[in-house]
Amino acid sequence: MGRYSVEPDNATKSCKARGSNLRVHFKNTRETAQAIKRMSLRRAQRYLKNVIAKKEIVPFRRFNGGVGRKAQAKAWGCTQGRWPKKSAEFLWQLLRNAESNADYKGLDVDRLVIDHIQVNRAPKMRRRTYRAHGRINPYMSSPCHVEVILSEKEQVVAAPTPDEDAPKKKQSKKKMARQKLMQRD
């Protein structure tokens, strides 16, 4: 069992999942993970399915050199985006694993939110490609480690409505005297 970089605030109301040395591009996976951070579990799964079907886009904000401009990215407040299919599939599988962990712990799956998701670089894997004039160049892959923590969202309690029974705001003697003078006039 590997270590997580962050421990959840309430361990009984959260679940974890992680993947190590995943053969999927680090940069694409990082941008996809940033897009689903703080989403509910159901919304994130639906979003990743839409990315695979090219109905929703992943905004590329940090690793955006050479990334084309797309109209769908306007929904995210940026101009550049892509549909990283393999990254979306890997993250979807990881969310499914976290969901089954939550189900095993007896958590309410419909109230789960992605509290923490992190993508780290893994050791590069080396291959070679053959070039002209007998040269050989490296042909590296950029795998990654991914960890996700889902937490149950707390029930939102409505704020109390202001009633007539509520205590009135205190006023200074000076202010009360001024109001009495204003009422006489």
Swiss-Prot record:
Region called Disordered, residue ranges: 157-185
GO molecular function, one term: structural constituent of ribosome
InterPro entries, per the entry: Ribosomal_uL22, Ribosomal_uL22_CS, Ribosomal_uL22_euk/arc, Ribosomal_uL22_sf
Database matches in PROSITE patterns: RIBOSOMAL_L22 (PS00464)
Compositionally biased region (Basic residues): 169-178
GO cellular-component term (any): cytosolic large ribosomal subunit
RNA-binding found in the keyword field: no
Entry annotated with the keyword Methyltransferase: no
Biological process annotations from GO: cytoplasmic translation
Keyword set, alphabetical order: Ribonucleoprotein, Ribosomal protein
Family: Belongs to the universal ribosomal protein uL22 family.
The protein, known as: Large ribosomal subunit protein uL22
